[in-house]
A protein has these predicted regions:
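Glycine-rich adenosyl-nucleotide cofactor-binding module
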Residues: 127, 148-190
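Accessory substrate-recognition/RNA-binding modules or partner subunits associated with SAM-dependent
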Residues: 2-142, 150, 159-161, 165-166
């Protein structure tokens, strides 16, 4: 029996219902549209299928740790509680992308630094000083997404790598190209 888990597909505002229908058509379960995203459940095969076949998704995320935090110190402590060794080793590289809609967390870059510090300190506490994964902005082994809404924090794995709109036919960008995800959404809505 395959084990289902929660996933989140990010999209543009206004395309949530179109993406939800696409996911249902691919066999996703418990599909729930939200604000610029659609949550759903499925197994590993569904994760791959969503990345390959969804025309109106920008990214497919897999939530790994949810918690509440009132400030950046609490964010650091709660992020440090996660077993980061289950995702990477001290030889791995990682990157963090942060989106914050909160009165308390107003600087997404500072949030990124605090989560990065929590991950680095988790490894240093277990493997010794200097034994931690490196940060790499491009082509990291593990891509982490931090989403904050109010005091609710979700840490997710980004299974897509680059934004899915870049998987199209273009070799190079032209002066004013239309995003492939947006174009697909417009066609599907018409």
């Amino acid at each position: 029996m395959k084990e289902n888990f929660e996933m989140v597909a990010k999209t543009f505002q206004g395309l949530e219902d179109v993406l939800a229908e696409e996911l249902r058509g691919l066999g996703a379960e418990n599909v729930e549209p939200g604000r610029r995203m659609v949550s759903f459940e499925g197994d590993l095969e569904m994760l791959y299928r969503a990345n390959m076949c969804c025309r109106t998704a920008l990214r497919i995320l897999k939530p790994i740790h949810k918690f509440t935090a009132e400030n950046t110190d609490e964010l650091y402590e709660r992020a440090k509680e996660f077993d980061w060794g289950s995702l990477m080793t001290p030889q791995s590289t990682f990157s963090i992308d942060t989106v914050a809609y909160s009165d308390e967390f107003t600087h997404s870059r500072f949030v990124t630094y605090r989560v990065k510090d929590a991950i680095a300190d988790w490894f240093c506490d277990r493997f010794g000083e200097g034994q931690r994964p490196g940060v790499r902005l491009q082509d990291a082994d593990v891509m982490i997404n931090v989403h904050i809404s109010g005091d609710r924090v979700t840490l997710s794995l980004d299974s897509s790598g680059e934004s899915l709109h870049k998987r199209g036919y273009r070799v190079a960008q032209t002066e004013a190209p239309i995003n492939e995800v947006l174009a697909a959404g417009i066609i599907l809505k018409s």
